[in-house]
Curated annotation (Swiss-Prot):
Compartment list: Cytoplasm
Transmembrane intervals: none
Protein name: Protein GrpE
Gene: grpE
HAMAP family to which the protein is assigned, alphabetical: GrpE
Sections of the chain in a coiled coil: none
GO biological process, one term: protein folding
GO molecular function: adenyl-nucleotide exchange factor activity; protein homodimerization activity; protein-folding chaperone binding; unfolded protein binding
Family recorded in the similarity comment: Belongs to the GrpE family.
GO annotation, cellular component aspect: cytoplasm
PROSITE patterns: GRPE
Its job: Participates actively in the response to hyperosmotic and heat shock by preventing the aggregation of stress-denatured proteins, in association with DnaK and GrpE. It is the nucleotide exchange factor for DnaK and may function as a thermosensor. Unfolded proteins bind initially to DnaJ; upon interaction with the DnaJ-bound protein, DnaK hydrolyzes its bound ATP, resulting in the formation of a stable complex. GrpE releases ADP from DnaK; ATP binding to DnaK triggers the release of the substrate protein, thus completing the reaction cycle.
Source species of the chain: Listeria monocytogenes serotype 4a (strain HCC23)
Length: 191
């Protein structure tokens, strides 16, 4: 009987040992799952932080690009302002220049008038030299092909000696500042 009892005890010990092993394995599995959940939460947090970092980096790069564009635009505006600084002064002086040209077109036999005209011509030439220094030029007209960017056609002509669309007369001089037209030439164009 003692042998049976020993076998029963042994069997009970084995069962108990097996139950303990199963319990240990279950605890390990639960711990692993909990650790996996914790790891997954940590990974999710890391992923979220990485996404936020990427978003902030992208915003930073966009802001940096915007700043560079504003800086370039400011430089271009400043350069254009410097380049065309004398435009308003030239526009204000053009009527006076036109008056000089009309006065110089008159002729007289009187010596006093000739001296006055000579003085006016000197002033006129000085204004033209000052214009040239600032990059202001007369727009060529007579004999040139009509260009609506530089010329304003106010009359048509029928001259057989001139080509089609050729300017035959200039009624008012046009001027440009570097590459910008200040005032187009008023012209007569051949048909």
């Amino acid at each position: 009987m003692s042998e049976k009892k020993n076998k029963k005890e042994k069997l009970a010990d084995e069962i108990e040992q097996e139950e303990l092993n199963i319990l240990d394995e279950t605890e390990e599995t639960v711990e692993e799952e909990a650790a996996a959940d914790t790891l997954t939460e940590e990974q999710a947090k890391i992923l979220e932080l990485e996404n936020k970092l990427d978003e902030v980096e992208n915003r930073y790069l966009r802001m940096q690009a915007d700043f560079e564009n504003v800086k370039k635009r400011h430089i271009a505006d400043r350069d254009a302002s410097q380049k065309y600084r004398s435009q308003s002064l030239a526009q204000d002086l053009l009527p006076a220049l036109d008056s000089f040209e009309k006065a110089l077109a008159t002729t007289s036999d009187q010596e006093e008038v000739k001296q006055i005209l000579k003085g006016m011509e000197m002033v006129y030439n000085q204004i033209l030299v000052a214009f040239e220094k600032e990059g202001i030029e007369v727009i060529p007209a007579v004999g040139e092909q009509f260009d609506p960017n530089f010329h304003q056609a106010v009359m048509q002509d029928s001259d057989e000696n001139a080509g089609s669309n050729e300017i035959t007369a200039e009624l008012q001089k046009g001027y440009k500042l570097k590459d910008r037209v200040i005032r187009p030439s008023m012209v007569k164009v051949n048909q």
